[in-house]
Amino acid sequence: MTSLSVVGVSGNIARPSRTAALVSAIAAQVAALSGSSNRLIELVDVGSRLFPSVNADGLKAFARDNLPQEGRSAIEAIETADAIVVGTPVYKGSYSGALKHLFDLVRPDALIGKPVLLCATAGTPLHGLVTEHQLRPLFGFFNAFTLPTTIFALESDFQNYQIGKAELAARVKRAAAEFAELLEAKAARQRPEAALAFA
């Protein structure tokens, strides 16, 4: 059976990025625990492909068909992934505008039932509910399955843009284990013997 794919999506628009480090750590642990492949998409890399002022055809990139191939490939990777880890830095009390634009280009039916793990980074604990009040409703629109456990991290939880506190590392480990267990159950349902059991 083909291994499941985990795609990490980080809404950072600068590098180095604590958000990217967090998303990457979660996705890597999930992949290791579940035997999945994983890929990291950072907005700092694909943003120029999602926001070209004018593309080769002279059309603004408000529709995916007008995007360069690299931009379309990022969206298709999200749509075809078996599971997604989504993280954002907090800007003005919400997720980054670049992250919202990316998901505005995702097909409304592409994430139905897809497992999604949410995380965010911020400079103050006052934004601690951003995963619940901002990110979860966004993926509720897509009818995705968002993991009950989310991760919120502060700048002080990192050292040199890498996870620096044991408490955050423990939360990442717990969330990754829960997500991997969910993926393993999904993989089991896709095995031929599972299908025969319900025939």
Name every feature range the model reports, one short phrase each:
Residues 1-88, 93-100, 170-173, 181, ...:
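N-terminal beta1-alpha1-beta2 submodule of the flavodoxin-like/Rossmannoid cofactor-binding fold
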Residues 3-8, 115, 152-160:
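A short small-residue
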Residues 10-12, 120-122, 155:
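Short, histidine-centered active-site or binding-site loop motifs used for metal coordination
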Residues 24, 28, 97, 133-137, ...:
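Residues on a specific face of well-ordered alpha-helices
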Residues 28-31, 107, 140, 184:
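A general structural signal for alpha-helical elements within enzymatic catalytic domains
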Residues 41-53, 141-159:
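Mobile beta-alpha loop/short-helix "lid" or hinge segments that flank ligand
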Residues 66-142:
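Helix-loop-strand module that forms the ligand-binding subsite of alpha/beta enzymes
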Residues 146-199:
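Glycine-rich phosphate/pyrophosphate-binding loop and the adjoining helix
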